[in-house]
Each structure stands twice: as C-alpha cells, then as structure tokens.
Amino acid sequence: MKLYLEFLSIHIKKAMQYKASFLLSALAQLFIPLTCFWGVQFMFMRFKQVDGFTYTEVSLCYAIVLLSFSLAELFFRGFDTFDRMIGNGEFDRVLVRPRNEVFLVLCSRMDLERFGKGIMAIFLLIWALQNCPIDWCAARVMTLIFMILGGIVLFAGVYLIFAGLCFFTLEGLEFINILTDGMREHGRYPLSIYGKGVLTFCTYIVPYALVQYYPLMYLIGRHNDARAMLLPVIACVFIVPCYLFWKFGVRHYRSTGS
C-alpha cells in the first residue's frame, strides 16, 4: 500500500505540472456524463416512466454505475491502454522488476482527470438519494456500498480481459468497449428494459446485473429480500477468471523487440 501511495503521489505531481490543462480536462470529463444525463431527463419529460421506473430511480441507477465506472477508469487506466505498453516494449521492463505485473501495470498510469466524471456521479447520487423514497435500513446502506464497490471490481475485470487480449493481438480490440463504455451507457437504465436476453447475458456471462439490476430492485423497495445485498459481492468472483486469463496471456507473451 505504501508503494502504491508513492506511485499515486507521483501521478498527482505530474498532473499538477500543468494545472490549467488538468482542470480543463477534468471539467470536460464532467460534462461528458452530464450531456448523457440530459438525454435521460429529456426522455422523462415526454414519458413519466420507463418499464415502471421513475426518473429518480433511473437517476439513482445511472449515478451508481457512473461512479463505479469513473473510479475504475481512474485507477485501472493502465490496463485500458495496455496495448501501448506492449507495442513500445515497456512491458519487458515490467517483467524484470521484483513486483507483481498487475500491480506495476496498475501503477503505470492513473488518469486523474477522470475524477471529473466521479464528481458528476457523486452530485447525481446525492440528488437521487434525496429524492428517491427509499426505506433505509442497515442492509440497504450496505447494498448501496456493495453496488459501487462491486461495479469497480467488475469493470476492473473487463479491463483485465482487454489487457489479456493484447498479448495475442498486440493491439487493443475495440469490441471490448462494448463491455466498458457499453456497460456504462446501458447502465443509465435498469437492465430489464433491454429485454430478457440482455438481462440473462448480464446475469450469467458478465455478471453486470448482479451489481446493477437485482440489488437496485431491493434498494428502491421493489422487494424486501435482503439477500440481494450480497449479489454484488458474488459478482466480484468475476475478477478470478479475468485474472487467470491475464496470467495465461503473460505466460504466452513474446516481446515485440521494441
């Protein structure tokens, strides 16, 4: 942890070298989800409900997903840009260092500008929690926390898959963005509105529904089964096959010679 904090300090100092550029980039990141949220707002000006969900419930859903994604994107950016590390030979240096490869890639890049999305998500989450009639109890508080943390782990797993694919393609594959940016965009609404097929895929293949749809149903009072609180914890198991795929890629890595 001490070494990680040292890396974080280095990245902060690097970002602060050009403060105006950093603040403008963070501001731009703030407006990206804001425009998406306006789209949701305009739709609810025309339709009062979507698949039985109100504006505040959808806003709560979007805020939780956006916060998870923004934190994962901020701290796991090294895996999202891993194809560059492969291409320029930087990963060769990682392999000869006496630290775990995942840890070193994790520390290689942190896009602190992405905290702009996180700020927007926090404001939206506070507003949604104030306006959504939730019958609060300890289990629902833990559900909210687990949804955010589980979402971070889930997005981190997808980034690991992306990085693992880079060992075999040498370049990133754009289709993986369906599982990162796509999950963030689809996360604006509860997954049930996309149909049974999507909900099934996001339950058993990529367990996105376990950190979004099912615990959300308990959080907003659609049912009172407190076991839904544990679903985001179960979804965290997804990181295990993702890590194994990454290790498989490391074992088959061949240097580019750069």
Locations of the language-model features?
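Hydrophobic transmembrane alpha-helices and immediately adjacent juxtamembrane helices
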Residues: M1-S258
